[in-house]
Swiss-Prot record:
It is a multi-pass membrane protein. Keywords: Cell membrane, Developmental protein, Differentiation, Disulfide bond, Ion transport, Membrane, Phosphoprotein, Spermatogenesis, Transmembrane, Transmembrane helix, Transport. Mediates the transport of organic anions such as steroids (estrone 3-sulfate, chenodeoxycholate, glycocholate) and thyroid hormones (3,3',5-triiodo-L-thyronine (T3), L-thyroxine (T4)), in the kidney. Capable of transporting cAMP and pharmacological substances such as digoxin, ouabain and methotrexate. Transport is independent of sodium, chloride ion, and ATP. Transport activity is stimulated by an acidic extracellular environment due to increased substrate affinity to the transporter. The driving force for this transport activity is currently not known. This is Solute carrier organic anion transporter family member 4C1. SLCO4C1-mediated digoxin uptake is inhibited by digoxin itself and related compounds such as ouabain, digitoxin and digoxigenin. GO terms for biological process: cell differentiation; monoatomic ion transport; sodium-independent organic anion transport; spermatogenesis. Residues 44-60 have a biased composition (Low complexity). Residues 1-105, 167-172, 255-274, 337-377, 444-447, 604-612, 691-724 are cytoplasmic. CDD domains: MFS_SLCO4C_OATP4C. The modification Phosphoserine is found at residues 15-16, 24, 26, 28. It is found in: Basolateral cell membrane.
Length: 724
């Protein structure tokens, strides 16, 4: 009788908790457990039945050498020694009232609080403060882009080492370290506000048509304020060092502490909270930007939010995050190395690791010498690498849209930047959180196997791919823009903002303040030829505009003036916004529904002792191929659709003011479809390559035959014990 089909799996090695469970069982139970969980034992047992006089050497000497009647105290001490389960507290302080926290739910609560804090700072406050920091410290956009990338660079450099060494360490204390670093990074990021001095206002910008204007000096000199760039980068590097253990060791600790069918629900909840953080960060940051940057001078200055010189108090949110993050250090450090019941939970788990020819030594990974071999082992796991590449492709598109969706909404549907950002956040954040929770819930509800979770992720990606073509439907024609798509009623030229009607106004392209008159949008009141504003009216209204032909009366003033222009963009005639938001919301849900299943699949398809390292590799590759290049690729793509650049009086090109809406929609569809196809390809290839461990049918077959072979098996086991 040959070994059963599918049993031979070198990667499928039982963990030490399973050994403890079998030591306390009766001989018959030992036989059934061995047949159902120990591949090498299963391969050797049929041969022993054929030749009982030749005892087989067991690959696990500790199993046969231990007597079957091990005491409960012995088992308990072995369990505590292996998993170091303990009570919640610090040193000798372990009050009973705090033991309610010493559960998976208690740890999940603290994990979620730290994930929310990290999301508030890194993906909320930093993103919303970048433009203010750029103006305050006189930096180029390329430099502020480097600030944004510093977090991912730090994460990439540290993720492998933290995940490898942290796997053998005290994971909750690693998360206490993460809370410390996140708080420190937030504090460092806010320091330039306290050392750069008081913000000095420049002169008011004249936005109307004047025949004489002071010339602008183009002598460039490097400002000392730009040196604070290095402080911001240091803050981001510290934040990256804090985020590394949070999303590698924290996820692995959650997976350790709960049964397999609940793991996806816990992980999905934790990831959903990390998405909730940016939502809070955007709301908090937006409110703080309505406060003047120098709080003490806020009431004494005449400048308002409508003034281009206005800068908000971007730094307050970082101080609040610093305090909150450091308040989590002590709670995390009070958790034991393993929560109570971890040994029992691990004993009941069945490995679903992908079968390969790699070494699966139980002691593998305990020494630093094993790091290169462990890294090589994971890189040779084709299923794992396919899943990592699929998440990287998905990360590229999600980070790109997270950065530029407000810009797309603003330009396609003619909205203000603040309202577009609000709508973008209202679609992205709830959709992503709902998708994460729903994906984790479905995997947990139906107790999907590793292969089924990959199939589920493939299905959700397919739905998201189909709905991604919403950008083709949502495209809107550009509204008439004088000098860009409209030629000043035939008196000017396309591509030139200057026309005979404003030639004597000495207008500057350094200040973009759009106005609308006669259904046409103008770059500024000056380019519309407006010489006078109407005071104390919201929105601001201009009259005596030489470039606007149709006369419009202003009834709110004592006199009647003609040739009116109103501040702001012209109202768009495109009514596709509600449909676009609804469909894109569904796209986001299905996109993020695959996140938790893929993470669970990665945890299941690798060796138990390499899960943290696997997550570290995933996050490193995800950032190298996804989150770092994603915004850059999206930025270059959107810039390629620009039809009106900001060129100041010194001839230096800045940001883009007007985009070709049709071309932008087509380009975003091309990126979305390409990334989704890559994601589905690697998901499908992972499903094709995956070789599961013994199926339930194989295990049931052995359990049914265990009764027949029980007597011979007990004799064989006793013989090995005597010889040992």
């Amino acid at each position: 009788m040959k070994s059963a089909k599918g049993i031979e799996n070198l990667a499928f090695v039982p963990s030490s908790p399973d050994i403890l469970r079998r030591l306390s069982a009766s001989p018959s139970q030992i036989e059934v457990s061995a047949l159902s969980s120990d591949p090498q034992r299963e391969n050797s047992q049929p041969q022993e039945l054929q030749k009982p006089q030749e005892p087989q050497k067991s690959p696990e000497p500790s199993l046969p050498s231990a007597p079957p009647n091990v005491s409960e105290e012995k088992l308990r001490s072995l369990s505590l020694s292996e998993f170091e389960e303990g009570s919640y507290g610090w040193r000798n302080f372990h009050p009973q009232c705090l033991q309610r926290c010493n559960t998976p739910g208690g740890f999940l609560l603290h994990y979620c609080l730290l994930a929310v804090t990290q999301g508030i700072v890194v993906n909320g406050l930093v993103n919303i403060s970048i433009s203010t920091v750029e103006k305050r410290y006189e930096m180029k956009s390329s430099l502020t882009g480097l600030i944004s990338s510093s977090y991912d660079i730090s994460f990439c450099l540290l993720s492998l080492f933290v995940s490898f060494f942290g796997e053998r360490g005290h994971k909750p204390r690693w998360l206490a370290f993460a809370a410390f670093m996140i708080g420190l990074g937030a504090l460092v990021f806010s320091l330039p506000q306290f050392f750069s001095g008081e913000y000095k206002l420049g002169s008011l910008f004249e936005d109307t048509c004047v025949t004489t204007r002071n010339s602008t000096s183009c002598t460039s000199s490097t400002s000392s304020l730009s040196n604070y760039l290095y402080v911001f980068i240091l803050g981001q590097l510290l934040l990256g060092a804090g985020g590394t253990p949070l999303y590698t060791l924290g996820t692995a600790f959650l997976d350790d502490s709960v049964p397999t069918h609940k793991s996806s629900l816990y992980i999905g909840t934790g990831y959903a909270m990390s998405i909730l953080g940016p939502a809070i960060g955007y709301v908090l940051g937006g409110q703080l930007l309505t406060i003047y940057i120098d709080v003490a001078m806020g009431e004494s200055t005449d400048v308002t939010e409508d003034d281009p010189r206005w800068l908000g108090a971007w730094w307050i949110g970082f101080l609040l995050s610093w305090i909150f993050a450091w308040s989590l250090i002590i709670p995390f450090s009070c958790f034991p190395k393993h929560l109570p019941g971890t040994a029992e939970i691990q004993a009941g788990k069945t490995s679903q690791a992908h079968q390969s020819n790699s070494n699966a030594d139980v002691k593998f990974g305990k020494s630093i010498k094993d790091f290169p071999a462990a890294l090589k082992n994971l890189m040779k796991n084709a299923v794992f690498m396919c899943l990592v590449l699929s998440t990287s492709s998905e990360a590229l598109i999600t980070t790109g849209f997270a950065t530029f969706l407000p810009k797309f909404i603003e330009n396609q549907f003619g909205l203000t930047s603040s309202f577009a950002a609000t709508l973008g956040g209202a679609v992205l954040i709830p959709g992503a959180a709902l998708g994460q929770i729903l994906g984790g819930f479905l995997v947990s509800k139906f107790r999907m196997t590793c292969k089924n979770t990959m199939k589920f992720a493939l299905f959700t990606s397919g739905v998201a791919l189909t709905l991604s073509f919403v950008f083709m439907y949502a495209k809107c024609e550009n509204e008439p823009f004088a000098g860009v798509s409209e030629s000043y009623n035939g008196t000017g030229e396309l591509g030139n903002l200057i026309a005979p009607c404003n030639a004597n106004c000495n207008c500057s392209r350094s200040y973009y303040y759009p106005v609308c008159g006669d259904g046409v949008q103008y770059f500024s009141p000056c380019f519309a030829g407006c010489s006078n504003p109407v005071a104390h009216r919201k929105p601001k209204v201009y009259y005596n505009c030489s470039c606007i032909e149709r006369k419009t009366e202003i009834t709110s003033t004592a006199e009647t003036f003609g040739f009116e222009a109103k501040a702001g963009k012209c109202e768009t005639h495109c009514a596709k916004l509600p449909i676009f938001l609804c469909i894109f919301f569904i796209v986001i849900i299905f996109t993020f529904m695959a996140g938790t299943p893929i993470t669970v699949s990665i945890l299941r398809c690798v060796n138990h002792r390499q899960r943290s390292l696997a997550l570290g590799i995933q996050f490193m590759v995800l950032r190298l191929l996804g989150t770092i290049p994603g915004p850059i690729i999206f930025g270059f793509t959107i810039d390629s659709t620009c039809i009106l650049w900001d060129i100041n009086d010194c001839g230096i090109k800045g940001a883009c003011w007007i985009y070709d809406n049709i071309k932008m929609a087509h380009m975003l569809v091309a990126i979305s479809v390409t990334c989704k196809v890559i994601t589905m390809f690697f998901n499908g290839f992972a499903i094709f390559l995956y070789k599961p461990p013994p199926s339930a049918t194989d295990v049931s077959f052995h359990k049914e035959n265990a009764v027949v072979t029980n007597v011979l098996a007990e004799q064989d086991l006793n013989k090995i014990v005597k010889e040992g």
